[in-house]
Amino acid sequence: MLDNIRAGAKGRGSCPAGTNNRDLSFDFAKGILITLVIIGHLLQYLIYQGTDAFWLSPYFKSIYMFHMPLFMAISGYLSSGAILRKSFTQGVGERAMQLLLPMLFWCTLIWTLKSAVIFPMKSLTDTLLDLSTEVIGTYWFIWAAFISFILIRVLTTFNRLSIWIISASAIAVAFAPITLSITPLLKYTYPFYCLGFLFAQPIGWQNGVIWRYKWIFVVLLSIAAFICFLGWGKETYAYNNLVLIHDEQSAKQVFLMFSGSLAASAVAMQSMFQCWRLVYSTRVARFVAVQLGQSTLLLYLVQGAVFRLMDLIQFGEVWNLTTRITFATVLGVAIVVIAMAIRSIARNLGYVSRIVVGAPPRPSLLKSQSVIN
């Protein structure tokens, strides 16, 4: 989701000139996933606002079963090059500049806007607590991706044993009895980051077994995902079970969560690849891949800010279901339009682009600045 690294996989779609052989099939998948993130939050914060009914919504469930795990798996896959080729200091430093710097900017913006409209003014302690909540909680996925990157980078120092150690770490982290802050969400997504990273390695078993019987696996995983979907409930979400096993029932929910997410993610990824093969030449597919898929960090930051500020709006009874759906549609489109406008403007403002968007300025702008200097 949050990586601008070229994918190593080939043959899933054509790449136009000037893209440096970037595999747009992954960008297409990321574009669809960030759209699902926005839709999922629209369901939670608008359609079902004020109730807990969204936990049982089949639409919410079908999205949350796989969208963040798959995002994390793609991030691990695309981060493989940076993890293996760059030094620890360089890799972590670049990832911090790419992820944490724009996140801090947007968290500060959210906190400033909320503080400006909330009266009376809070104490300094409450103010700092609110700021820390924005920094850690609002964009938890960024922290999960950043921490996962660091963990994998450290574990790769074990050379030949690193694959086995990374696999063991996925299990150890997933079942660690820790529930502090966003730790449950890290425990939930880290194994998928590891899986994505391992799939990027030239181990040989992917081509030998999985790809040879791909469609058999797809059918079996589709059946498994459907069964898990039927059993998925409120306590199956990592937000509620905290990925913590303390009795037989909690073990069942955690196992169902990981099994359902794994099966649904695999089926969804294969479906997106097949869809890309069929429609990659269309304008809609190119928009999803190039405009949305290559702007997922900015879209995630913008939608996070919008939905955090939605806490300031109270919907009355006049907001019936039809009105909410209409407003949600308009807001979803507005988020995309605003993000695209910010991207277009910020990329022309030099290093402001790194602070706001998390991406370098346009190459032409960098060249002109170097000539001036």
From Swiss-Prot:
GO CC, one annotated term: plasma membrane
Entry's Gene Ontology BP terms: enterobacterial common antigen biosynthetic process
One Pfam family hit: Acyl_transf_3
EC number: 2.3.1.-
GO MF annotations, alphabetized: O-acetyltransferase activity
InterPro entries: Acyl_transf_3_dom, Nod_factor_Fuc_AcT
Keywords: Acyltransferase, Cell membrane, Membrane, Nodulation, Transferase, Transmembrane, Transmembrane helix
Residues in the signal sequence: none
Transmembrane segments: 27-47, 62-82, 98-118, 140-160, 164-184, 212-232, 253-273, 286-306, 324-344
Domain of life of the native organism: Bacteria
Keyword Electron transport appears in the UniProt entry: no
Membrane topology type: Multi-pass membrane protein
Compartment(s) where it occurs, according to its Swiss-Prot or TrEMBL record: Cell membrane
Task of the protein: Thought to be an acetyltransferase that modifies the fucose of the nod factor.
NCBIfam families: fucose_Ac_NolL (NF042426)
Family that this chain belongs to: Belongs to the acyltransferase 3 family.
Name of the protein: Nodulation protein NolL
Organism whose genome encodes this protein: Mesorhizobium japonicum (strain LMG 29417 / CECT 9101 / MAFF 303099)
